[in-house]
Amino acid sequence: DPADEPASELLGRIREQRRKLDAEGKAKLPKGGESVIFCGSDGRRYEKWVDAKGRESELVCIEDEIPFEIPDSWEWARLDSICDLVRGSGIKRSDIVDEGLPCVRYGELYTTYETSIDTVASHTSEAVFDVSKKLGAGEVLITLTGENNIDIGRAVFNATGETLAFGGDLLALKGKNVRGDYLAMAINSSVVGSQRTRASTGNIIVHLSATKACRFLIPVPPLDEQRRIVERINEFVTLITNQ
């Protein structure tokens, strides 16, 4: 839709907000500065890094990383330039109780949830909940440990409307200017799936480091387009499910 705010303005707003929070001591910019990806005059994609003082690194051509062309109103962005990443800490099996506060353990992203957490399967005590990392409504979790390099790094977003505690081997993606449902779908797509596989290590037990997850290249549409994409995918899923 030509009336949509371009993703370049959305990303610019994210960078401005993060620099403000960094200046106030409420957040830290990514190590080495924030990634900015743009199309050069030669039509190729370049990346630079801008630190808190506005100093820019040398340009690096990343055209070989771009998997396909996107509409003019879209942008490519590194995962850590559109959201803050927070690692979880252990909620053990023995910490799970029948009644308590909602929590998520990494194995449940493989066995219980598809692309969203609609109803929480596990609960823990108030004591464990209070010291655990938290996932806000609409935020995303990805797995850092798995059994193969295809499923590793798969994502779900929190659709419960509640704050959830989350355990170790999980990475929370926290961003207010990108839809969590779109981001989870993008990460689970083949576009990011191939990046997840290449970034993984190990055979019997497969791992994905938060440092490598930060570098995932994400196609970012305007916010309204993100909503339309999610709605259309959900329509197709409903049709397939009801067949």
Placement of each model-derived feature along the sequence:
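Short, small-residue-rich loop/turn micro-motifs
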Residues: 106-110, 212, 233
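Non-catalytic DNA-recognition/assembly elements of restriction-modification systems
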Residues: 4-13, 17-20, 59-89, 219, ...
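Extended, domain-scale alpha-helical bundle/helix-rich regions
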Residues: 1-58
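Short, well-ordered beta-strand elements within core beta-sheets of diverse protein domains
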Residues: 65-70, 127, 171-175, 214-220
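A short beta-sheet element
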Residues: 105, 127-188, 202, 207-209
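Sequence-specific dsDNA recognition surfaces
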Residues: 53, 59-65, 80-93, 107-139, ...
